Design a protein with these regions (language model features):
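Intrinsically disordered, charged low-complexity linkers and terminal tails
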Residues: 1-194
């Protein structure tokens, strides 16, 4: 996140304009090229963890719906192998109740409409949109498991307590959320809404 936080806006725009060279779409590779990986990161880089983090960095997000699902897995730094509908709903509501995030649920969303959405309606949207698309396009990292809404593939189990995994997952989630809202803000400026 430091690279994003302290980068000049003009340089950031250039970096994201060239997707194959965008360090935010392949941060571990970027550090590797600079010979900046520490020993633990080097071990992580050589395994399946790098592939998983790369998926998180590059998963399509035309809307921000996947963020609360990823945050449910991240679980405030205690990464989970599977999440229940209740955990997804809790993460979803925590995310969309923060600030004006609720505006991103639908084009004409108001706070009154948001507050009137039932848990059942939220769950329907969670399962039919972000969960469905992570299962479909998640390169096999996200899997359907009995008794839970969605899980991670078993090969990731040894990594869920790995400090590199925890740090990288947090950075990706934080960056993707900040990038999304920065783009939303710029679009609203262009549209004359700000």
């Amino acid at each position: 996140m430091d690279l994003f936080t302290y980068m000049d806006d003009g340089i950031y725009e250039i970096a994201i304009a060239h997707s194959k060279d965008n360090p935010f779409k392949k941060y571990l590779e970027f550090l590797k090229e600079l010979d900046e990986l520490n020993q633990d990161e080097e071990v992580f880089y050589k395994g399946i963890g790098r592939e998983f983090i790369s998926l998180l960095e590059n998963t399509s997000m035309s809307k921000v719906y996947k963020m609360p699902v990823l945050m449910a897995f991240y679980n405030h730094g205690d990464i989970l192998m599977e999440v229940s509908e209740e955990q997804l709903l809790s993460s979803w509501k925590e995310f969309f109740s923060t600030g004006t995030n609720w505006k991103d649920l639908d084009k004409n969303m108001t706070i009154q409409k948001y507050n009137s959405i039932s848990d059942k309606e939220h769950l329907k949207k969670i399962l039919s949109m972000p969960v469905h698309f992570l299962l479909e396009s998640g390169k096999g990292f996200f899997v359907k498991k009995d008794g839970v809404a969605i899980g991670l593939r078993e090969e990731l189990r040894p990594l869920i307590d790995n400090p590199v995994m925890v740090c990288q997952m947090k950075d990706v989630i934080d960056y993707r959320a900040m990038d999304y809202y920065q783009r939303r803000y710029r679009q609203s400026q262009e549209d004359g809404e700000v």
